[in-house]
Structures are given as structure tokens and as C-alpha cells.
Amino acid sequence: YKISRYLWYSFLKMQKQVAPKLQNIITPSQSSKKGIIEEFNCKKDNITVINNGLDTEEFSPIVGSVRDPNRLITTASADVPLKGLDYSLKALKILKKDNPNIHLIVIGSYKKGGHTERLIKELDIKDNIFFKKHLSKEEIRELYSTSSVALVSSLYEGFGYPVIEAMSCEVPLIATNVSSIPELIGKYGILIDPKDENQLSNKIRIVLSNYEDYKKNAIQGRQHIINTFNWSKITHEYEKAIFKTI
């Protein structure tokens, strides 16, 4: 999925003219850097990659919390095809056949009468899916801390905050191998092909069946997030980029 497929904002026409003339462009991932080079005809030496940061204390596992072995969690703007929620819903349908108690928490909302609501009805998973909206960061943290597996089934992410938020809360993560996601995860999560609910459901089964092993990897994943995306490091990188430019 290239950046060009989603050039729906009119201001991007102006950016195509301006971007090649800029001395330094800062972007949050190697994937987005590649897209800028291809779509805006910019020189690679004029683009600096600085990750977005995360408050890893706000997104941290709650001590003493118990993870529900039947609870999956995802963050998605329902009815937005890019977020790939359809494939998480279809995977849930597959898993429900063997485990009627499995359920998916979706941090987000859906449009009344929209595509997502219709798909949920078609798949007969209404009792297995719960949408949560207008949550505080502490409430999001609580949901992550009581979930066993986090899903990111996006088709494109310039920078996937749901990826690093879940990892910071030590939730074993399964995510699609697209755009920026692999560089965020490193070796601390499971990558799957996009648009493949069968592969997704199979990986969920594997994680739940070997949970202690994936839990250990998730603990290491949190340390990776702390080391890579802490605001002190990000701020220092911005300072260097700014001073280099001026």
C-alpha cells in the first residue's frame, strides 16, 4: 500500500510543489520516508526519520491485573477500510466456532447502519464484540492490562500508535506486515499477511496455547518500546535535526 493511494487531501497537491524545496523534512518512520521520496520527488538526504514518542508510564501494565484468556483487543476507526477491522471481525467469527466465550474489545466506534454494523450482524458476532469510545488513557490502560492478545490488522500505517501502546502495556501483539508496522515491532511481535483472517485466527490460537512464551516476549517488547520511543530520546533527536537545519 503506497502513500499515493490515499492522497485524498487537497493540500497534498500544494505539498508536492513545496516538499522538494525543503531543506529538511521530518517523518516518523522509514516507511513514510520511502513514500515521501517516491511521491514527492524529495532527496533522501533531506528527510530525517524521527519516531513519534510515547509516555510509557501512561501506557504500562497495571500491577496485579489479571488477563482474561478470552479477551482480544484492538484499536480501530470502524468503517475506515485502511484500519482493516473487517479481518479482525472475520477472525473472531472463526475463533468463536471453537470458543464461544472469546470476545474482542474495540477501542473506537462504528457508524450506525454502516458497513461495520452490517458485517457484525452478518457474521453473528454481536455478543462477542464490544466497542469502547471516549475513554481516558487510564481506562485504555486498564483494558490493555486485562487483555491477552492485541490485534492490529491495518492495511496501512504511517506510524502505528496502537502497536507501541499495546507493546508498552506488555500485551502479546499480532499485526499486519505492512508499511511502518514491522519497523516498530522488531522481533517482539507476530507479523501476518494483510487481509488474511485465517492466518490471523491461527496465530491467535498459537499465542493463547503457548501464552507463557509469548508473555515473556511481550515483557521484552515493553523494554524495546521504552528504549526506542521514550520522549527524552525523541526530543534530543528533534533538537539535533533543528540545529542542523538552522
Please report, for each region that a protein language model flagged, where it lies by residue:
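Conserved acidic donor-binding segment of nucleotide-sugar-dependent glycosyltransferases
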Residues: 190-197, 206-211
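Membrane-proximal helix-turn-helix segments that form the acceptor-binding/catalytic region
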Residues: 4-25
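Nucleotide-activated donor-binding/catalytic signature segment of Leloir-type glycosyltransferases, i.e.
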Residues: 116-138
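Conserved donor-binding/catalytic core segment of Leloir-type glycosyltransferases
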Residues: 65-83, 89-92
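Carbohydrate-associated surface elements
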Residues: 31, 53
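Short alpha-helical donor nucleotide-sugar binding micro-motif in glycosyltransferases
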Residues: 134, 142-147
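Aromatic "clamp/platform" in nucleotide-sugar-dependent glycosyltransferases that forms part
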Residues: 155
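Short hydrophobic beta-strand element within catalytic cores of glycosyltransferases
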Residues: 172-175
